[in-house]
C-alpha cells in the first residue's frame, strides 16, 4: 500500500455472501464427525486393542498441528485466481483427497487383510492420517476467509453461521448410521468387517462434501492482494515477509496464550470423549465389552445419536451466546464450559440410555462455547498481517492437548483398570479446570 492508497476498512457483506463463505464447512464437519464418532468403532472392529486406541487418536491432532499452520502460512503468500484466489485453492486440494479417503477407510476390513492383523491396522492408520491431513487442509480456509473478508461488526454473525453449519453437519453425520439401520441397512457384519450402515454413511458424507465445497469455491470471490492490503491497512508485501512461525508466536497478543490455556483442558476432555465414550456407554448401558457384539454396535449407533443431540444443543446455545453482550464473553464462556464438565463426568455414573441425552445436551453447551469464543477472542486482537498463519498456529491449541491426552492415556487407562467410564470422569475433571482457566483471560482488541 502506497501513500496514495486510502485505508478503506472491510466493507459490509451481504448475508448471502457470508453464508457462502461458510457453506462448505457443512461438508467438512460431516467428514470430521463421521471420523471422530466412528473411528473407535472402526478400529475395534478391525481388531485394535482397546488399550492401544490412543495411538490412532493421536493422528488427527498431529495432522492439524502441522497442516493448519502450514496452510495458513502458504495461503498468506498465495494468489491463484483461476483456482479461487488465496485460500480456496487449498480447499479444493484438501476436498479431493478427503473424498478419496472417505471412500477407502470404511472398506479396509473387506480387503482380506485379516482381523487384528498389522497390515489392516497400519492401512487404517495411514488412511486416517491422509484423511486428517486433507480435511485439515480443506477446513482451514473457512476460518481464514472470515478474518480476511468480514468486518468486526459482522464477524460474530459470520462465526455464528459457521458454528451453526458445523453443528448441523455433525447432526447429519451422527444420524447417518442410526437412520440407515432403521431403514434396514445391516448394522453388523462378519468379524473384522465394518457394517454397511457405517460404509454407506461415509459414501453419502463424501458426496455432500463435494457439493458444499464446490458451492463455496464457485460463489465466493476473495479479495485480490491490492484490495486486501487496502482493506486491512497493510502493505501488499507484509504477508510475504517475516512469516517465521516462532517469530510470530513471540509477537502474538497475550490473549492468544490465555485462550490457549483454556483450550488445553477443553480439548483434553473432548479427546477422551471421542476415544472412550462408545466403550463407556456400551459397558454401562448394554453391558457389552466385545466390539463385534450386537450390544456394542448398538452403543456405537447410540453414541452417534448422542453426538447429534450434542450438536443440536450446540446450535441452540450458539444462538443464545450470540445475544450475550461483548462485556460478558468470559461469563458465557466459563458457565458453558462448566456445564460441559458436568456432562462429561456424568457418563461415568449413568446406566440409562435415555438419561445420557441430558449429558450430551450439557456437552453441546460446552461445544458451542468452544466453537464461538476462542476464534472471536483471538481474531479480535489480530491485524490483517499473517492472519492465516496466526489462525493456523492457534489451531495448535486444539491439536496439542489432544496429542497430550492420547499419550497420557497409555498411562492413565491402565491405571484406571482399563475402565472407559473412568476415563469419562477424568474428562469431567479436565472440563472443570477449563472453566476455571477462563478467569485468567483478559480480552483485548487490535488498534
Residue ranges with predicted function:
Residues 66-83, 316-329, 413:
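Helix-to-loop junctions at the C-terminal end of transmembrane segments
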Residues 330-373:
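C-terminal transmembrane helical hairpin of 12-TM major facilitator-type secondary transporters
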Residues 137-150, 369-383:
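Intracellular juxtamembrane helix-capping segments at the cytosolic ends
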Residues 91-117, 339-351:
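C-terminal ends and interior cores of transmembrane alpha-helices
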Residues 49-59, 196, 287-311, 422:
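Loop-to-transmembrane helix entry
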Residues 1-16, 109, 114-129, 135-138, ...:
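Intracellular loop-helix junctions on the cytosolic face of multi-pass helical membrane proteins
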Residues 5-63, 258, 262, 266-290:
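Helix-loop boundary and gating motifs at the non-cytosolic
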Residues 50-51, 152-162, 300, 382-394:
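Loop-to-transmembrane helix entry/capping segments in MFS-fold secondary transporters
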Amino acid at each position: 500500500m502506497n501513500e496514495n492508497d486510502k485505508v478503506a476498512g472491510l466493507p459490509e457483506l451481504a448475508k448471502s455472501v457470508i453464508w457462502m463463505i461458510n457453506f462448505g464447512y457443512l461438508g467438512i464437519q460431516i467428514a470430521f464427525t463421521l471420523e471422530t464418532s466412528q473411528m473407535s468403532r472402526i478400529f475395534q472392529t478391525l481388531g485394535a486393542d482397546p488399550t492401544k486406541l490412543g495411538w490412532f487418536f493421536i493422528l488427527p491432532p498431529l495432522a492439524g498441528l502441522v497442516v493448519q499452520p502450514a496452510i495458513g502460512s502458504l495461503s498468506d503468500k498465495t494468489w491463484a485466481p483461476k483456482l479461487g484466489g488465496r485460500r480456496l485453492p487449498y480447499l479444493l486440494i484438501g476436498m479431493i483427497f478427503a473424498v478419496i479417503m472417505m471412500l477407502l477407510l470404511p472398506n479396509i476390513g473387506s480387503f482380506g487383510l485379516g482381523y487384528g492383523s498389522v497390515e489392516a491396522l497400519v492401512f487404517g492408520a495411514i488412511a486416517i492420517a491422509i484423511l486428517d491431513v486433507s480435511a485439515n487442509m480443506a477446513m482451514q480456509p473457512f476460518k481464514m476467509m472470515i478474518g480476511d473478508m468480514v468486518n468486526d461488526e459482522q464477524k460474530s454473525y459470520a462465526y455464528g453461521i459457521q458454528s451453526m453449519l458445523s453443528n448441523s453437519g455433525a447432526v447429519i453425520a451422527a444420524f447417518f448410521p442410526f437412520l440407515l439401520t432403521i431403514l434396514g441397512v445391516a448394522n453388523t457384519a462378519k468379524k473384522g468387517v465394518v457394517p454397511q450402515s457405517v460404509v454407506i454413511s461415509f459414501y453419502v458424507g463424501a458426496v455432500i462434501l463435494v457439493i458444499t465445497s464446490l458451492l463455496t469455491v464457485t460463489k465466493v470471490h476473495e479479495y485480490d492482494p491490492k484490495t486486501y492490503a487496502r482493506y486491512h491497512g497493510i502493505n501488499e508485501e507484509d504477508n510475504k515477509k517475516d512469516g517465521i512461525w516462532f517469530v510470530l508466536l513471540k509477537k502474538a497478543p497475550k490473549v492468544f496464550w490465555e485462550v490457549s490455556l483454556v483450550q488445553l483442558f477443553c480439548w483434553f476432555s473432548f479427546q477422551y470423549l471421542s476415544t472412550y465414550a462408545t466403550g463407556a456407554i456400551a459397558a454401562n448401558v448394554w453391558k457389552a465389552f466385545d466390539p463385534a457384539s450386537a450390544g456394542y454396535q448398538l452403543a456405537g449407533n447410540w453414541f452417534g445419536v448422542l453426538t447429534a443431540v450434542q450438536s443440536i444443543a450446540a446450535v441452540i446455545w450458539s444462538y443464545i451466546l450470540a445475544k450475550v453482550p461483548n462485556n460478558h464473553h468470559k461469563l458465557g464462556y466459563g458457565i458453558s464450559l462448566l456445564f460441559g464438565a458436568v456432562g462429561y463426568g456424568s457418563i461415568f455414573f449413568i446406566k440409562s440410555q435415555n438419561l445420557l441425552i441430558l449429558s450430551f445436551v450439557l456437552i453441546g453447551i460446552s461445544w458451542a462455547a468452544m466453537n464461538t469464543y476462542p476464534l472471536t477472542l483471538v481474531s479480535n486482537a489480530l491485524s490483517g498481517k499473517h492472519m492465516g498463519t496466526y489462525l493456523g498456529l492457534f489451531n495448535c491449541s486444539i491439536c496439542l492437548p489432544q496429542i497430550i491426552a492420547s499419550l497420557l492415556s497409555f498411562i492413565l487407562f491402565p491405571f484406571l483398570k482399563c475402565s472407559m467410564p473412568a476415563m469419562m470422569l477424568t474428562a469431567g475433571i479436565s472440563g472443570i479446570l477449563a472453566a476455571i482457566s477462563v478467569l485468567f483471560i483478559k480480552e483485548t482488541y487490535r488498534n
